[in-house]
């Protein structure tokens, strides 16, 4: 998937370089995002009148957020600032970052998340390791269809530095035009 997406970008006239993710991304995903997402949910649902209708996964997340400590949230915010600095270094050398949109192939619609990815047990956010850090840093990103894997639709994400929204949007039509004509424009729903 990544190689094919990189080749498509090259065919569209872009230089593509492989680089390991900054270590700050993994630290963020492991230590900061669980705190930020659960406390954020607790904040948003302070006045929600239908908490009894939450899925069990969201109810658990809400309970963690309500039990969270301010010191944990401040530590998570410090990790976000470290990640922002690490990504600023990346964007000094590269215009955009290419990642998968998800760490997992599509899973059944009646399941809240995949239980395993690449043979490893994961929690409810295991599939989102490529998007959570982008959201927390407030960076623009574009999800693009990238074909099929094991007969399932998959995508890639292009992430840009702050203020690069127009660059990302301008790239989308060229990406779409380079799609394999056999790729359906709408994925069949089953």
Residues of each region from the PLM?
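Short low-complexity, flexible loop/linker segments enriched in glycine and/or proline
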Residues: 26-38, 113-115, 157-159
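Small-aliphatic-rich amphipathic alpha-helix that forms the alpha element of a beta-alpha
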Residues: 88-89, 120-145
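Short, surface-exposed loop/helix-turn segments at secondary-structure junctions
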Residues: 106-128
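Short helix-loop capping/hinge segments that flank enzyme active sites or metal/cofactor-binding pockets
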Residues: 35-88, 100, 104, 143-153
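Short, Asp-centered acidic motifs that coordinate Mg2+ and/or phosphate
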Residues: 95-96
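Gly/Ser-rich, acidic/histidine-flanked active-site/gating loops
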Residues: 1-32, 66-68
């Amino acid at each position: 998937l990544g190689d094919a997406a990189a080749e498509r970008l090259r065919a569209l006239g872009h230089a593509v370089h492989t680089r390991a993710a900054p270590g700050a991304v993994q630290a963020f995903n492991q230590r900061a995002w669980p705190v930020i997402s659960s406390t954020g949910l607790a904040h948003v649902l302070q006045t929600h009148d239908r908490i009894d209708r939450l899925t069990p996964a969201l109810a658990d997340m809400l309970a963690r957020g309500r039990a969270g400590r301010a010191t944990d949230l401040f530590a998570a915010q410090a990790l976000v600032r470290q990640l922002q600095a690490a990504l600023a270094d990346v964007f000094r050398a590269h215009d955009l970052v290419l990642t998968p949109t998800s760490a997992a192939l599509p899973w059944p619609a009646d399941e809240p998340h995949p239980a395993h990815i690449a043979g490893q047990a994961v929690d409810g956010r295991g599939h989102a390791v490529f998007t959570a850090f982008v959201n927390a840093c407030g960076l623009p990103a574009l999800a693009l269809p990238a074909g099929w894997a094991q007969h399932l639709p998959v995508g890639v994400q292009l992430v840009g530095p702050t203020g690069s929204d127009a660059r990302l949007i301008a790239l989308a039509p060229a990406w779409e035009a380079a799609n394999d004509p056999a790729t359906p424009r709408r994925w069949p729903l089953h």
